[in-house]
């Protein structure tokens, strides 16, 4: 993989998309200061990993497109979303927010989702499975 910088990766996008992407990157870096940021050119996104013991775990991404940019979460299906603000509910795992410009980026809304996404990613597979099973059993209780 090339060592493409996020700035270089985002440069071709329209100003509002690029600016929104930079704001989203800043939110992730503030909320998860030890996040490892890397451009994934094949996936057309900037991905984030969090250190988890002797490994690192993928937890989210900033994915620009010509008319909008997504802030997405790898284990989004496990995130609490009582107000149903996350998109991607028809997807298996990932959930996301969509922005058309920098003024739509609200750190106070996003920070809890970013923080929890990093925490979930750092769990072991067994711990995540236990969460799924707990939620399934809670939803089946009368």
Residue ranges of model-derived segments:
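Charge-dense, helix-prone N-terminal extensions
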Residues: 1-142
């Amino acid at each position: 993989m090339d060592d493409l910088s996020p700035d270089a990766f985002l440069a071709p996008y329209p100003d509002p998309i690029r600016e929104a992407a930079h704001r989203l990157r800043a939110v992730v870096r503030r909320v998860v200061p030890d996040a490892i940021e890397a451009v994934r050119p094949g996936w057309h996104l900037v991905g984030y990993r969090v250190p988890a013991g002797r490994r690192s775990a993928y937890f989210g991404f900033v994915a620009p497109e010509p008319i909008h940019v997504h802030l997405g979460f790898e284990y989004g299906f496990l995130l609490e979303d009582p107000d149903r603000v996350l998109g991607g509910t028809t997807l298996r795992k990932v959930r996301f927010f969509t922005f058309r410009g920098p003024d739509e980026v609200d750190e106070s809304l996003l920070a809890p989702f970013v923080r929890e996404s990093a925490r979930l990613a750092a769990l072991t597979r067994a711990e995540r499975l236990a969460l799924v099973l707990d939620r399934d059993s809670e939803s089946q209780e009368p």
